[in-house]
Amino acid sequence: MKDWVKRYNAASVVVAERPEALCRLANSAGAVVCSSLMRCVESRSGLGCDCRAEPDPLFAEAHLPYPDWSFPLMPSRFWRITFRTAWFFGFARHTEPVSESRRRARAAADKLIELAHAHDCVLLMGHKVMNALIARELRRRGWHGPAMPLLSGYWHPSRYSRRS
């Protein structure tokens, strides 16, 4: 699992798959921010927008934990589900604990709200689990948007707006 996690974190993205509607959304946003993970930086670059903000580790994915043993051999999907579930219950071997990811999500929500006040529209190119943690924070603070952004597909945005 250790090697799989390492390869996954170093993997590139297929930028040709990006939908044109997302490119238009990125070009209309006042600010486009992203995680510091390479696949996220590449995804943002593929949007063809003016991306002045530096990639920020604050938005980086809550990495998948893994044990120090390599048996039994099971499909990676099984281990991803097993270890992500275990992570939510406190297993954080080789990664930050869920409490730290939640702290980062609060700080990320602060930053996105600040950017939204300054630029009106902000696009975050992020990652599933961290996006879900950030969404939870935004909704707690009165923002309106999907409760489960984990269910949206790759390249599909989730929109959050201030409640009037």
Predicted segments — roles?
Residues 46-49, 69-70, 137-141:
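Short, glycine/charged-enriched secondary-structure capping and boundary segments
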Residues 1-58, 75-107, 145, 152-155:
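Active-site-proximal alpha-helix that buttresses catalytic centers in soluble enzyme cores
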Residues 106-164:
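Active-site-adjacent alpha-helix immediately C-terminal to a catalytic or transition-state-stabilizing loop
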Residues 40-43, 62-66, 131-134:
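Short catalytic/ligand-binding loop motif for oxyanion handling, primarily in non-cytosolic enzymes
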Residues 58-74:
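Signature for phosphate-centric chemistry
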